[in-house]
């Protein structure tokens, strides 16, 4: 089973919207998929940060286990529109949160 990372078309006529999905290469373009990892809206301006939204950690996982990216997904990666670096989430500990509240009270 060859697995591909590709675009699946959704949206209305002349108003396309794409989902970035991981699917079996034999499945239809808009058919069954394994996992939805992002979306692409070509109707938004190119500098809009929501034009392409991808779960970077899942994309990296699927590429590491051997999934092949389609030409358009590879183009997004090469242009830097999709970054494979996972964004670090800010996690505040309970102690840091309590300390911050105490500082604001004083």
Curated annotation (Swiss-Prot):
It comes from Wolbachia sp. subsp. Brugia malayi (strain TRS). HAMAP family: Ribosomal_bS16 (MF_00385). It comes from the Bacteria. GO terms for cellular component: cytoplasm; small ribosomal subunit. Keywords: Ribonucleoprotein, Ribosomal protein. Belongs to the bacterial ribosomal protein bS16 family. The gene is rpsP. This is Small ribosomal subunit protein bS16. GO terms for biological process: translation. GO terms for molecular function: structural constituent of ribosome. The keyword Ribonucleoprotein applies.
């Amino acid at each position: 089973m060859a697995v591909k990372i590709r675009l699946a078309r959704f949206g209305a006529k002349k108003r396309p919207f794409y989902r970035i999905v991981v699917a079996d290469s034999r499945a239809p373009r808009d058919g069954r998929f394994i996992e939805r990892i992002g979306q692409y809206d070509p109707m938004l301006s190119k500098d809009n940060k929501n034009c392409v939204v991808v779960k970077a950690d899942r994309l990296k996982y699927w590429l590491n286990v051997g999934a092949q990216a389609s030409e358009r997904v590879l183009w997004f990666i090469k242009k830097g529109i999709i970054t494979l670096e996972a964004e670090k989430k800010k996690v505040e500990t309970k102690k840091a949160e309590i300390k911050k509240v105490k500082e604001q009270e004083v």
